[in-house]
Amino acid sequence: MTNENSNDSEFAELKIRGKIFKLPILKASIGEDVIDISRVSSEADCFTYDPGFMSTASCQSTITYIDGDKGILRHRGYDIKDLAEKSDFLEVAYLLIYGELPSIEQYNNFTKQVAHHSLVNERLHYLFQTFCSSSHPMAIMLAAVGSLSAFYPDLLNFKEADYELTAIRMIAKIPTIAAMSYKYSIGQPFIYPDNSLDFTENFLHMMFATPCTKYKVNPIIKNALNKIFILHADHEQNASTSTVRIAGSSGANPFACVSTGIASLWGPAHGGANEAVINMLKEIGSSENIPKYIAKAKDKNDPFRLMGFGHRVYKNYDPRAAVLKETCKEVLKELGQLENNPLLQIAIELEAIALKDEYFIERKLYPNVDFYSGIIYKAMGIPSQMFTVLFAIARTVGWMAQWKEMHEDPEQKISRPRQLYTGYVHREYKGIGER
């Protein structure tokens, strides 16, 4: 295989059944290089085995870079902390999709397009009526997003010219559907988007306004939610993003692809972790109980797990968690809860104790992005069943950037993982009366 990133003078040798194969090493612009194993199956009659794809690069990407050992997260080369503190969500969305920060004119045009496409077809309202009142907002959202392909049949056979408009439509409509999912779950009327508001203000308006009551957006709350959206916008080839790419590799329409991402995100090991953190803090109950629960977390025979600590990639403090810790304090101070919020006090003391404990230090278990986000959501008045829905709003930007990049990659093929078969070799069929 030839690749513009390969280095002819550098290769890895793989010996299989006495035969040596030279595998090109593909050079990363930063971070780990990659061994190209694409020829192994055809030339050596072997596949590689990597459960969970922990050591496998499924694609080339220029969008997001993570150094888990150093606690670095960058989008298109920009540090996540700088983006969270200095940018806004739609500017980051533009960056992820187009590769560069926008000019004033580009930014204004982009935000106008997002606002223009925020309405959903009125017939979609009837779909919501088919759900029972106790339906989880993620279940409603999953169905509603998938149904969008029925309203945009032209995208069943999309072209390269459709990529950008498709991304804009998705970014615009997901918050509307998310707010509708919440409103339906609590029995309130849907609130239409307001194009005079910015992206984050508009979402809060659709969530908390009613036909008889206007919602006044608190700027501290707005800024906090803006940061949360930025911090969750993309995170390289995680489970849901990989799911979107795999679905997209078959040529499936973009609404179907995003709905698969939502389904993957709904898993408690992925998008549902911040809700688990809240439940854990409630279970701990008070600071006095922290040592007992630390001991339970260390006991391999105890089912209790310390939620919000550790990450599949980060072996250092998650840079997103550092931003959210300060954001959490800002929000609670604004709401008059900084000194008397029991969950925050437990979280801060739990973090302090864990970071000094050799058990957690040796295992590199540091607070992750989920540790403080749930406390912020709860203080904002957002119920726990909506936590993953908000995650999906933010991650839609990353999904669409990755989906677009995948379709623009000339090397990308339909995804087809292989397996190590360990079942029966061959069995003769017997009729039901002979078994």
Swiss-Prot record:
Keyword Cell membrane in annotation: no
PANTHER family, per the entry: CITRATE SYNTHASE
Biological process according to GO: tricarboxylic acid cycle
GO MF terms, alphabetically ordered: citrate (Si)-synthase activity
UniProt keyword terms in alphabetical order: Transferase, Tricarboxylic acid cycle
One GO CC term, this protein: cytoplasm
Catalytic activity, reaction form: oxaloacetate + acetyl-CoA + H2O = citrate + CoA + H(+)
Catalytic residues identified in the record: 311, 370
Pathway the protein takes part in: Carbohydrate metabolism; tricarboxylic acid cycle; isocitrate from oxaloacetate: step 1/2
Keyword Transferase: yes
Gene (name only): gltA
Similarity comment text for this entry: Belongs to the citrate synthase family.
UniProt-recorded name of the protein: Citrate synthase
The protein's enzyme class: transferase
Protein source organism: Rickettsia felis (strain ATCC VR-1525 / URRWXCal2) (Rickettsia azadi)
Further comment found in the protein's record: Citrate synthase is found in nearly all cells capable of oxidative metabolism.
EC nos: 2.3.3.16
